[in-house]
């Protein structure tokens, strides 16, 4: 604690102002990137960007693909420019030669000298250190960078990729630490990339460096989390003394501010022997930056926490805890007993324009044959034995599945699994055949295909239609009622913006307790999970969270 208070004593406004400015520029930049992505995709009638449609975008929409490449390059350049501002600004503060005009002039000169090379290097640094930055500094713009969660989810799909991913990440971290001086040498000394790599490797090879590194890391952790714990303590006191007042939004905003403050203090700790003075004219700027950051974070928190935790529960693919083969009648019969609000299931169109309940676009994994659902008739598909989760059964046609659900008053969340070859026919045939049934029994439809969704809106009310988004790269569409979002890409801002626009946000598929708690703390409308019984328990516990406990969940998982 002595170190922390000593740091406060020596910490001056200049670094805090600089960190605030960098954070605000990054935050605005991310928002502008979303607007640009939305503009590009809307003009080409492309609903979203994913690995599955990337080839289609490149071939059929080259201008959109070019625009997205340009956007990515601009993102790298912006990241490098902000890093340059930070490095030059801190150096100026240390030498008491700070000047805003000089800072921006020099940073632009460096940007012009290294341009894309500097952007790539900074991007690699950001990718490698992002998990630690997320954990230590709860700044608004970092909370919207969900790449860490996406990568973690991807490599966790099986033990081999998990172990391999962890080993690769450890190697990446080691080299990033060894080369941490590359950017400062390039920015401050105009070093070439080769010279900077050699110098950084030489400096970081000694035992004294690693000793200082671990000591600095411990200090940074203590500084950052001591502040967060103080804010949590204030919330605990507020829960006790002022239970009628909801101060969650205020403390959520304080988290954002403290994330920026602790970042500045952490940098200052490395130079405690130097008196850092406040550059002239920064008091008004600092006040404005604090006000803007606090207001934006407060607004997000206010929207997030203004409703109780009571999400719709949805059983993913009709199973609970692997109690059967997904998307089959046998599993439906078992899972209904757990009383989910909805059972999510998937539908493919067959060769004879009928519908089979099935998720995969290839039958190899479930049935052991190399065929697609649209290549076979419904009768042929129903003869297949499918195996999963140590269970074996037959595939179920959609009519039978739907009839059983209606008889037991079980609402369905139906995913329409279209392909590029059948999307239009699929939507028209499905809507004509099942529109009345879906409306009468309050079922919901969702799909990854935007054009399918637009066609369905001609026959089915928007309130029964949801749009699935694997990645959160655009701003909400006005004509979409609800979004299904991959839980690893959920961010507080995305949930808040949609709630402000009176749009619903579902999330899929959090299965661990930690992932479920993240979704609950952000106040999503519905949760799609493979473990609906665990979800019920988690919701009951979350409904008894104090405001401090909910704030802690947001702190840990956002």
Regions flagged by a language model, labelled:
Residues 316, 335, 346, 381, ...:
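Conserved, mostly hydrophobic/aromatic
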Residues 324-334, 398, 426, 431, ...:
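Short, acidic/polar
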Residues 317, 345-347, 414-418, 447-449, ...:
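A cross-domain feature marking catalytic cores of carbohydrate-active enzymes
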Residues 301-375, 379-383, 400-404:
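Membrane-interface segments at or immediately adjacent to transmembrane helices
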Residues 1-313:
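Hydrophobic alpha-helical membrane segments
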Residues 214, 467-558:
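C-terminal active-site rim and adjoining tail of enzyme catalytic domains
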Residues 312-314, 342-344, 411-413, 442-444, ...:
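Structural preference for beta-strand elements that scaffold enzyme active sites
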Residues 359-463, 556-557:
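Metal-dependent phosphodiesterase/phospholipase catalytic core, i.e.
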């Amino acid at each position: 604690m002595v170190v922390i208070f000593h740091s406060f004593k020596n910490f001056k406004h200049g670094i805090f102002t600089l960190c605030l400015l960098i954070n605000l520029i990054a935050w605005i930049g991310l928002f502008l990137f979303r607007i640009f992505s939305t503009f590009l995709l809307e003009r080409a009638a492309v609903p979203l960007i994913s690995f599955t449609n990337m080839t289609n975008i490149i071939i059929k929409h080259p201008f959109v693909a070019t625009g997205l490449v340009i956007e990515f390059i601009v993102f790298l350049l912006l990241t490098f420019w902000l890093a340059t501002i930070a490095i030059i600004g801190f150096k100026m503060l240390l030498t008491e030669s700070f000047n805003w005009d000089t800072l921006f002039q020099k940073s632009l000169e460096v940007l012009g000298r290294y341009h894309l090379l500097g952007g790539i290097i900074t991007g690699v640094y950001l990718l490698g250190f992002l998990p630690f930055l997320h954990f230590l500094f709860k700044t608004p713009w970092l909370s919207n960078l969900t790449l860490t969660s996406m990568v973690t989810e991807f490599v966790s799909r099986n033990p081999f990729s998990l172990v391999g991913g962890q080993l690769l990440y450890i190697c990446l971290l080691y080299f990033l630490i060894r080369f941490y001086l590359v950017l400062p040498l390039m920015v401050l000394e105009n070093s070439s990339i080769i010279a900077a790599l050699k110098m950084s490797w030489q400096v970081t090879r000694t035992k004294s460096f690693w000793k200082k590194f671990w000591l600095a890391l411990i200090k940074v952790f203590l500084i950052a989390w001591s502040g967060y714990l103080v804010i949590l303590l204030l919330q605990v006191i507020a829960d006790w003394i002022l239970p009628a007042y909801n101060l969650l939004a205020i403390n959520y905003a304080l988290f954002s501010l403290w994330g920026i403050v602790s970042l500045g203090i952490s940098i200052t700790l490395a130079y405690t022997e130097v008196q850092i003075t406040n550059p002239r004219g920064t008091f008004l700027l600092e006040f404005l930056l604090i006000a803007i950051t606090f207001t934006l974070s407060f607004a997000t928190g206010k929207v997030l926490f203004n409703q109780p935790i009571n999400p719709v529960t949805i059983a993913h693919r009709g199973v609970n805890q692997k109690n059967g083969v997904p998307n089959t009648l046998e599993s439906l019969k078992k899972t209904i007993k757990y009383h989910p609000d909805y059972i999510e299931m998937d539908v493919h169109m067959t060769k004879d324009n009928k519908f089979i309940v099935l998720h995969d676009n290839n039958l190899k994994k479930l049935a052991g044959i190399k065929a697609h659902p649209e290549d076979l008739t419904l009768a042929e598909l129903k003869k297949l034995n499918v195996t999963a989760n140590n269970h074996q059964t037959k595939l179920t046609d959609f009519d039978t599945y739907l009839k059983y659900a209606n008889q037991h008053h079980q609402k369905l969340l139906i995913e329409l699994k279209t392909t590029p070859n059948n999307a239009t026919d699929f939507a028209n045939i499905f809507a004509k055949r099942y529109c009345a049934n879906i409306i009468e029994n309050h079922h919901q439809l969702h799909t990854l295909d935007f054009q399918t969704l637009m066609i369905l809106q001609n026959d089915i009310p928007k309130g029964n239609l949801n749009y699935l988004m694997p990645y959160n790269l655009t701003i909400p569409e006005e004509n979409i009622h609800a979004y299904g979002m991959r839980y690893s890409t959920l961010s507080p801002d995305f949930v808040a913006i949609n709630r402000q626009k009176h749009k619903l946000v579902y999330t899929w598929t959090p299965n661990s307790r930690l992932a479920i708690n993240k979704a609950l703390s952000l106040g999503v409308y519905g949760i799609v999970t493979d473990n609906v019984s665990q979800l019920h328990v988690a919701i009951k516990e979350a409904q008894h969270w104090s405001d401090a406990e909910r704030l802690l969940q947001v702190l840990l998982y956002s």
